[in-house]
């Protein structure tokens, strides 16, 4: 009987959390992050990603500003290095606080994939880590035009629900707020 109780307790201790998100141990001191886009051809995908994070329910906002006022520069070209790398976020931190960052994206990335990549890289800018146990914004790779472990969009649509509720929960954990699910998971490519 005692052995059964120990086994049951051990099983309870290894059950994974319902929330699959991960953080990096860093975050912004302020809930407002000033962002500048230096790649005009990526304006639409960046707008989609910023709007998705700003609607996530976390008490953090990306605000668009001129480059001279930016804490984060988005749209730097990722043209060398790992051919499998579609995007990259770099942050400068001091004592666990993120001070600035740069988001890189590969030239020629199609706009719907670019929106996914920007949402993912802005997640890193917020302090989120990779999450591959479930469908998440922070999955470490794309499969075509959608994150790993996420359902492929039906024909004629794209995955416009750029921030999953699980990732919104991670941001709310860091910045406060109540995570909200995106209004739509898929949207028509015709607008």
Task: Please give the residue ranges for each predicted region.
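Zinc-dependent metalloendopeptidases
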Residues: 17-191
């Amino acid at each position: 009987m005692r052995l059964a109780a120990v086994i049951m307790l051990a099983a309870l201790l290894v059950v994974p959390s319902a929330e699959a998100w991960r953080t990096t141990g860093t975050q912004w001191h302020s809930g407002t992050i000033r962002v500048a886009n230096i790649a005009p051809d990526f304006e639409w995908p960046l707008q989609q990603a910023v709007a998705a994070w700003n609607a996530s329910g976390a008490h953090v906002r990306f605000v668009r500003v001129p480059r001279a006022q930016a804490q984060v520069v988005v749209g730097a070209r990722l043209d060398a290095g790992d051919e499998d790398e579609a995007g990259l976020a770099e942050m400068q931190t001091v004592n666990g606080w993120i001070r600035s960052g740069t988001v890189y994206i590969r030239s020629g990335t199609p706009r719907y994939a670019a929106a996914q990549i920007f949402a993912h890289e802005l997640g890193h800018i917020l302090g989120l880590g990779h999450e591959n146990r479930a469908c998440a914004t922070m999955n470490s790779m794309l499969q075509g035009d959608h994150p790993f472990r996420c359902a492929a969009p039906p024909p004629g649509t794209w995955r416009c629900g750029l921030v999953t509720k699980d990732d919104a929960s991670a941001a709310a954990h860091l910045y406060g707020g109540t995570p909200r699910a995106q209004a739509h998971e898929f949207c028509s490519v015709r607008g």
